[in-house]
Design a protein with these regions (language model features):
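Local sequence-structure signature of Cys/Sec-based thiol-disulfide redox active-site neighborhoods
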Residues: 1-35
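Short, conserved sequence motifs used for protein processing/export or organelle targeting and
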Residues: 26-226
């Protein structure tokens, strides 16, 4: 959770990016939910406020891991790693997720297909977001505003709610497929967009996810039960 008005957010983002790139590349994916604060943030969406209230976010920047554990971004790296590792080790994925996008440039539209296969019979929900890189806005950085490039910005929720769309009960080793037709907003740059598919378990936590680029992106199943 961040904001253009937040003086400590650039430093927090630098720390989080370093931690992910050094220890969790391809495992942890970052989403930036912008909220209004002492001034309005041009990248704010309604769901940012809904989620910040849900997780009782009181300080910025803050991070929520798998819609479960919260942490500040000024924590010691060992503390941050412990929170990531707990989510990975204590709550392992029991489903695989694949996502693909077929982009129609003429209509500025993408057909997104999400596939979920479960290794056990369980109930799931699917949350799908549009995320954009390369947005340039003024940012408060340590008390001084400067030009700043914002990445991983959540632009739109494509599911019915932040709780996700019901996939129902998926039987062991069976696959469920859900498709979305996404009209791209005129203010978005298609080449900078990705779709994030978060598959939630029966407790409302992220069990697994997949990410693909908006322009004909494809991310096949990666999780394999050993």
């Amino acid at each position: 959770f961040t904001g253009t008005w937040c003086a400590m957010c650039p430093a927090g983002m630098t720390r989080l990016n370093y931690l992910i790139s050094s220890s969790y590349e391809g495992i942890v994916y970052l989403m930036s939910f912008h909220v209004d604060g002492t001034s309005a943030d041009p990248m704010t969406i309604e769901q940012s406020s809904i989620l910040s209230r849900k997780f009782a976010i009181s300080g910025y920047p803050s991070c929520v891991v798998d819609m479960r554990g919260t942490m500040g971004l000024s924590e010691n790296y060992s503390v941050m790693r412990a929170i990531f590792n707990e989510s990975l080790e204590k709550y392992p994925a029991h489903c695989g997720v694949a996502i693909s996008s077929v982009y129609n440039e003429v209509d500025s539209e993408a057909k997104v297909t999400v596939k979920v296969t479960s290794e056990k019979t369980a109930d799931y929900r699917l949350v799908l977001y549009v995320v954009e890189n390369g947005l340039k806005y003024q940012q408060n950085d340590g008390g001084n505003y400067r030009d700043y490039t914002h990445n991983h910005v959540v632009r739109k929720l494509l599911s019915a709610s932040v709780e996700g769309d019901k996939l129902g009960q998926i039987a062991e080793d069976k696959e469920e497929v859900k498709e979305y037709t996404v009209a791209l907003d005129d203010t978005w740059k298609a080449e900078n967009l990705s779709f994030y598919a978060l598959v939630m378990d029966e407790n409302g936590y992220v069990n697994n996810l997949a990410v693909c680029e908006a322009i004909n992106g494809n991310a096949d199943y990666e999780y394999v039960n050993d």
